[in-house]
């Protein structure tokens, strides 16, 4: 996860390789790169930002980046964001999934050319699809950078805030597998 106070999707990152291994031939077809926790300082303190108080999901070089104390003075001025930037440059992903949580409801959001993946995820999970332009702005976000700036499909899985992480994984396992296996 990117936000330290959003643990709902973390089990999915640990369980996905095992789930894929149970599908014949899946591991031979897929290269999977998993980051369980991009924000260990925030996770340890159960806060949104990192140790510098910066929201790492607003610190990417998207065209809509806005400097500020909570977002960073410039894109990638936080070591965690810089590390992910370097990883993306090295791995050149064909699809990115990121887990967050939202108060009061769950949904899947997408940026870039990811509509078919969002529809597939929604079909298998029952999560409604929320378009980015119908949500509050997220300047400098991972979705803005990966999806809009780089043109790589990205799904943001917004789990219900406070939900049980194991239940969240079990509820979305088949949807995540369907998306990953279709990429």
Language-model features and meaning:
Residues 2-134:
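Active-site/substrate-binding loop(s) of hydrolase catalytic cores
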Residues 106-108, 136-183:
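Active-site-adjacent mobile loop/cap segments within catalytic or ligand-binding domains
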